[in-house]
Structures are given as structure tokens and as C-alpha cells.
């Protein structure tokens, strides 16, 4: 098995389609935070082609000491419930390096996979060709400014995934109310919790980090 070469930064992220609010969770390892990375999922790539890259926003959820730790965090984020949710672009559970072994997908996920395969080139090496085509491309000042702003506004910053109530008081000052919603829903996953929270009048944002606080895998600053 090929050993992963460690990079300076390892993080989990969520990409949001600003047109239809669909999301995609993932991990990235890089030596340059301004490398222009915007996810690599099959459905996500198709959506970016359809709606335009400018209509997608990437938010960093948390930084980790190494790639394995980031993968472990991704496993917590991308559960089978997330994969089966029609409002996500994720086709595989997280933390497994792309393997689909050992879990059963819903009819919704099968449909997502089917759509992802339509029109897909059959020859091997296509993804490598696409990646190489991006090498050497310079990022515009506007793109760099947007990524810098995203990092500065990241509520988790470089504090190793410890959420802070200071950045979004509407969410974090009401954490007990949202926890009650979570418990009453049978301790649902991040996607369902988000839907329930929005229905209760809370912000349309990711509740993945808050969910980890509820489960005891993350601490609140």
C-alpha cells in the first residue's frame, strides 16, 4: 500500500452549492492553503460544471496534525446517512479512501451513482489528465482574497477543531436547545440535525462540529 506523503496542512471541509444548498464533505492535504482546491467528488465536479465554480463556497471545518487524523474526522462527518441524503454530493462514506465495501446504499444513492456515471469517460487515467491540466495555473487575486476571508472567518481556525461560540452566537449560545432537538430526533446525523435546526429557526449552516460536541468527540472553547 502506497504511503501518504505528509503535507503541512491537513483539514476537513464542506463545500456548499449557493444555488441549491447541496453540500459536499471532504478532506484535503496541502503545503499551500491558496492552492485553489475545491473538492474532487464526481457529482461535485458535474455540479460545478453546470452551475459554475463561482457558485460554490468552501469552508474549512478543522485542521489536523496529520492526514490520518483528517481522515478519521471525515469518517465522523460522512456517514451512511450523509451518503444516502439527496442534498449531498458525497457518494462514499468518509475515512475509507474511496472504498464502498461493507455498507448498503439506498435507492437514492444508487440513483446518485448512476447519474455520476453517465457520460463518464471509460479510459483509465482520465482523472490524472484533469489534475495535470490544472498544474501551473495561477489563482486570481479575487480567488486568493476569497480563500483568505474564508480562513479568517473560519469559526474553528487553527484551534484543532474546537468550536467557539464567539463566531456564531445564534448557534452556539443556543447549543442546549439544539442539543434537545438532536436528542428528541433520536440523536440523528449532521444532515438531519441541520434540517431540524433550520425548521426551528436556527441558521442555515453546518452543524457537524456541534454534533461532535454532543457526541463528546470535540470540546467547546
UniProtKB/Swiss-Prot annotation:
Location of the GIY-YIG domain: 8-91
PROSITE patterns (alphabetical): GIY_YIG
SMART domains membership: GIYc, IENR2
Cofactor(s) in the UniProt record: Mg(2+)
InterPro entries assigned to the protein according to its UniProt record, in alphabetical order: GIY-YIG_endonuc, GIY-YIG_endonuc_sf, NUMOD3
Top EC class of this enzyme: hydrolase
UniProt signal peptide: none
EC number: 3.1.-.-
Coiled coil ranges: none
Key word Aminoacyl-tRNA synthetase present: no
Assigned keywords, A-Z: Endonuclease, Hydrolase, Magnesium, Nuclease
Similarity field: To endonucleases of group I introns of fungi and phage.
Name of the protein: Endonuclease segA
Record organism: Enterobacteria phage T4
Annotated gene: segA
Amino acid at each position: 500500500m502506497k504511503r501518504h506523503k505528509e503535507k503541512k496542512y491537513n483539514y476537513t471541509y464542506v463545500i456548499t452549492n449557493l444555488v441549491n444548498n447541496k453540500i459536499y464533505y471532504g478532506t484535503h492535504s496541502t503545503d499551500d492553503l491558496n492552492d485553489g482546491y475545491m473538492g474532487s467528488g464526481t457529482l461535485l465536479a458535474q455540479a460545478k460544471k453546470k452551475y459554475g465554480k463561482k457558485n460554490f463556497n468552501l469552508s474549512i471545518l478543522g485542521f489536523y496534525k496529520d492526514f490520518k487524523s483528517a481522515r478519521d474526522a471525515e469518517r465522523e462527518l460522512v456517514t451512511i446517512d450523509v451518503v444516502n441524503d439527496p442534498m449531498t454530493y458525497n457518494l462514499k462514506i468518509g475515512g475509507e479512501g474511496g472504498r464502498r465495501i461493507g455498507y448498503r446504499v439506498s435507492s437514492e444513492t444508487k440513483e446518485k451513482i448512476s447519474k455520476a456515471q453517465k457520460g463518464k469517460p471509460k479510459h483509465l487515467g482520465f482523472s490524472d489528465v484533469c489534475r495535470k491540466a490544472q498544474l501551473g495555473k495561477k489563482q486570481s487575486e479575487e480567488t486568493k482574497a476569497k480563500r483568505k476571508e474564508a480562513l479568517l472567518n473560519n469559526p474553528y481556525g487553527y484551534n484543532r477543531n474546537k468550536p467557539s461560540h464567539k463566531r456564531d452566537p445564534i448557534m452556539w449560545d443556543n447549543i442546549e436547545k439544539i442539543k434537545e432537538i438532536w436528542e428528541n430526533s433520536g440523536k440523528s446525523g449532521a444532515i438531519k440535525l441541520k434540517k431540524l435546526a433550520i425548521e426551528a429557526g436556527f441558521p442555515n449552516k453546518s452543524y457537524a462540529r456541534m454534533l461532535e460536541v454532543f457526541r463528546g468527540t470535540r470540546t467547546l472553547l
